[in-house]
């Protein structure tokens, strides 16, 4: 099991191992590649987050429009029922 907290000694040992494995010349290349990868990952996650927010907003607008349409539809039905009732009273 790998410990979650690294102390100063562990970090120094890790850096020495990396230096021995890759050499001093390749470490800047690796750091650049890692930085580029992290940047692309952040762009991707922020882009996905923005898409989700846009879709959420569109769905809320659609639901709001449906509720308004249903409410206006109910209002029209009530008006028709009232008109029919009044017409029936006038005839009777």
UniProtKB/Swiss-Prot annotation:
Organism superkingdom: Bacteria
Transmembrane segments annotated in the record for this chain: 2-22
Skewed-composition ranges (Basic and acidic residues): 53-80
Keywords, alphabetical: Cell membrane, Membrane, Protein transport, Translocation, Transmembrane, Transmembrane helix, Transport
Membrane topology: Single-pass membrane protein
InterPro entries: TatA/B/E (IPR003369), TatA/E (IPR006312)
Gene Ontology molecular function: protein transmembrane transporter activity
Subcellular localization, as worded in the UniProt entry: Cell membrane
Keyword Transport part of the UniProt annotation: yes
Keyword match Acyltransferase: no
GO biological process, one term: protein transport by the Tat complex
UniProt region (Disordered), positions on chain: 43-92
This protein's GO CC annotations: TAT protein transport complex
Cited HAMAP family: TatA_E (MF_00236)
Subunit structure: The Tat system comprises two distinct complexes: a TatABC complex, containing multiple copies of TatA, TatB and TatC subunits, and a separate TatA complex, containing only TatA subunits. Substrates initially bind to the TatABC complex, which probably triggers association of the separate TatA complex to form the active translocon.
Purpose of the protein: Part of the twin-arginine translocation (Tat) system that transports large folded proteins containing a characteristic twin-arginine motif in their signal peptide across membranes. TatA could form the protein-conducting channel of the Tat system.
Family assignment from sequence similarity: Belongs to the TatA/E family.
The protein, known as: Sec-independent protein translocase protein TatA
Gene: tatA
